[in-house]
Amino acid sequence: MPISALDSFRWIKTMKIKLFGGLRQKAETAELDGSGATIREILHQISADHAELGEALFANGSSDLRPHIRIMVNGLDSELIGGLDPAVGVDDQIAIFPPIAGG
């Protein structure tokens, strides 16, 4: 029996994205399921599903991440591994941090 395109989408694996600080309130959860080949694709997918979170992550509806938002992949800042365009897989751990200030 051939597999339809719809059936093949059921096998796409998702990964867990952890949210911190005020981003949790925007998404109304501390953890989201996301899918995509790159960090950027995942961020756009979760932003499409959670509009308030998308507004907090991206400036004026653009694809530019707001300053001071930190994306960590397996404990490393995404800026150290090539920004938002490196490939990620289901075994990678992604965490998103809002700006943090202290004093």
Task: Show the residue positions of the predicted features.
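Ubiquitin-like/PB1-type beta-grasp interaction modules and other compact soluble beta-rich domains
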Residues: 2-102
